[in-house]
């Protein structure tokens, strides 16, 4: 069954990456929520897509109490996702101001998954491949996925490498998805969850190609497409 993954929650109808957006995603038929994890200056793991706030301040330079009220802790986000699975994207790109070679966010997220026994409900993804490699080292029972918008090798080579390292899925940008990608993923036992898809016709095309998940800002639209297919 193809899963509906609410991108930053039901982000077309509520402020993204907020408790409100996560709860609404469930009401609109999402199976999963995708959210973004970053850290504050005092080491708290919070949910926010960009490294900076809307006012330009950098999150990693601020303590938790300095953040706006709508920015939630990861713990609160997990509570708000009751009844759904969660794709936690760890934000740790080398070009970002909060890049951390020690992978403190990954370590904290793994600890939280273990503390709450969330292995069956959580998948961790990242654009930075060493991050998901570390997650696998820390806890091989946690599912992991490689996010990508560009590739530097063939789909066959990429899928073979990702599968050999024990990861669960590929998370490609929609514009990359074609039959060659799907064939390579299938050959190596990888799932494919696609981001970010809001057009119902494109959703139907991707379902026909055999994707496993649609990451979307409009989970109600995706649910309608899947129910009609």
Label for each model-derived stretch:
Residues 2-49, 112, 121:
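Conserved N-terminal beta1-alpha1 strand-loop-helix module at the mouth
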Residues 16-19, 65, 75, 220:
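Residues in well-ordered alpha-helical elements
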Residues 4, 31, 37-84, 90-93, ...:
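An active-site metal/cofactor-coordinating segment within enzyme catalytic domains
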Residues 18, 70, 74, 106:
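Aromatic/hydrophobic pocket-lining residues that form the small-molecule binding cavity
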Residues 75-76, 81-86, 90-229:
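Short loop-to-alpha-helix "cap/lid" segments that border enzyme active sites
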Residues 13, 69-72, 217:
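Residue-level signal for the nucleotide or nucleotide-sugar donor/cofactor binding architecture
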């Amino acid at each position: 069954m193809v899963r509906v993954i609410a991108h930053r929650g039901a982000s077309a109808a509520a402020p993204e990456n907020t408790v409100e957006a996560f709860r609404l995603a469930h009401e609109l038929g999402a199976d999963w929520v995708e959210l973004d994890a970053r850290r504050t200056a005092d080491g708290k793991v919070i949910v926010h897509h960009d490294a900076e706030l809307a006012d330009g301040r950098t999150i990693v330079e601020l303590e938790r109490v300095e953040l706006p009220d709508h920015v939630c802790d990861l713990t609160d986000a997990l509570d708000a996702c009751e009844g759904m699975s969660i794709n936690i994207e760890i934000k740790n790109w080398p070009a970002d101001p909060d890049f951390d070679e020690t992978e403190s966010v990954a370590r904290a997220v793994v600890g939280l998954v273990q503390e709450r026994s969330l292995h069956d409900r959580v998948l961790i993804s990242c654009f930075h491949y060493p991050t998901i490699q570390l997650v696998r080292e820390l806890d091989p029972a946690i599912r992991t996925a490689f996010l990508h918008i560009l590739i530097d090798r063939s789909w066959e080579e990429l899928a073979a490498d990702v599968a050999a390292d024990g990861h669960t899925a590929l998370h490609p940008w929609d514009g990359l998805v074609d039959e060659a990608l799907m064939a390579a993923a299938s050959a190596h036992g990888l799932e494919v969850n696609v981001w970010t898809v809001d057009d119902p016709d494109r959703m139907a095309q991707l379902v026909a190609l055999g994707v496993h998940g649609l990451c979307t800002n409009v989970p109600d639209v995706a649910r309608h497409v899947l129910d009609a297919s």
